[in-house]
Regions:
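A short alpha->loop->secondary-structure connector
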Residues: 102-113
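"Short basic amphipathic alpha-helical interaction patches in structured regions
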Residues: 96-103, 170-172
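Active-site environment of non-heme Fe oxygenases that use a 2-His-1-carboxylate facial triad
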Residues: 1-66, 70-72, 78, 83, ...
Length: 344
């Protein structure tokens, strides 16, 4: 049984929603000099030639705003666990250039990795599957549970919001842990022991549909805490009959989910055009409410996403296996749609 943290986490990322009455309390308005530096590096990178896979913090150095980026990165990695940057002129920049700018800035927070079988370093968060549960969540309009992704940090840049709904939600995993430590410490052992995850058709060739290893929800390595919470993939492994849950495991999952949705824990707000949020995915859960989309393709909800790896971050073996060194392996001919093997 892994060692369980039996003292509350007293870290900046152990915040509650009541600490941030509005997103204005943690937003940063970009200045002209920030945009000038970003645009200059986009032009320089395009002139040199190269693709998305060639972008990193050396090919996109952003030297003129390096001190600001270092401060923002510190806030994400070891501070609050998230920052909101405002003022990217998404209507005045081509989508191709916007992707370059986004990857270039994001590479200073971590190494961009693939987000699906398609090998996409920039994920298009668009409504392809409506409310179909067979489609990956980020390509649907259905309400999501608070969860983490398979990366150390994530970023979301809003190009267009939905016509109704689609609020972004966040909750500190450290706060959830602290509350459970106070109220139901007996349940934590199940969360530290972890669960087998369904791979949703994204396992490499020759690998099983469900992870061989238990993936810990909470873990601490060299004093550094991590969370992995994807209830949907745990549920799918159960629904297809690959694993069963004990009464204690089910209670622990339900209690964690209930705590995460408390009003004084969960923070919800609307992402508006030109707003970019960086989130420490090792410490912060995120979600999105159900939304209604426009019938006009050019007016539909559109965000773009990054998955970023922080290679130096200590993590348990199960965490490293879950995330992979390069994200989700690209597999030609495969997309983001999965048909469950659950019996009819």
């Amino acid at each position: 049984m892994p060692e369980i943290a039996m003292q509350p986490f007293n870290l900046p990322a152990a915040w509650r929603s009541t600490d941030y009455p509005t997103k204005d309390t943690f937003a940063i308005d970009l200045e002209p000099r920030h945009l000038e530096a970003l645009n200059a590096d986009v032009k320089r990178f395009k002139a040199a030639g190269g693709g998305h896979e060639d972008i990193n913090n050396e090919t996109f150095p952003l030297c003129r705003i390096a001190e600001d980026i270092a401060r923002w990165r510190k806030e994400v990695h070891t501070g609050r666990g998230m920052i909101l940057l405002r003022g990217i002129p998404v209507e005045d920049i081509s989508l191709d250039d916007l992707r370059l700018l986004y990857l270039g800035l994001g590479s200073h927070f971590g190494r961009p990795v693939s987000q699906s079988n398609m090998g996409d370093l920039v994920g298009e968060v668009v409504n392809i599957g409506d409310k179909d549960p067979k489609e990956r969540a980020y390509r649907s309009s259905r309400e999501l549970m608070l969860h983490t992704d398979r990366a150390d940090h994530i970023a979301m840049l809003c190009i267009r919001p939905a016509i109704k709904g689609g609020l972004s939600g966040y909750a500190s995993a450290l706060t959830i842990h602290n509350i459970m430590l106070e109220e139901r410490p007996d349940l934590l052992s199940h969360l530290y022991n972890g669960f087998h995850h369904h791979r949703f058709g994204e396992q490499p060739p020759g690998e099983p549909v469900v992870t061989r290893e238990r993936i810990p929800i909470f873990s601490v390595t060299d004093g550094v805490p991590s969370v992995i919470f994807i209830r949907g993939y745990i549920n799918l492994a159960v629904d297809e009959g690959h694993v069963t849950l004990s009464d204690g495991e089910l209670e622990a999952l339900n209690y964690m989910e209930s705590v995460s949705n408390r009003d004084n824990v969960r923070l919800d707000f609307l992402m508006e055009p030109g707003e970019l949020i960086f989130v420490n995915n090792c410490l912060i859960l995120h979600t999105r409410t159900e939304f209604e989309d426009s019938d006009e393709p050019t007016k539909r909800r559109h965000l773009i996403r990054l998955w970023l790896r922080e290679d130096e971050r200590p993590a348990a073996d199960g965490v490293l296996i879950h995330k992979g060194k390069a994200g989700i392996e690209k597999q030609d001919g495969k997309g983001t749609y999965y048909t469950s093997k659950t019996a009819a």
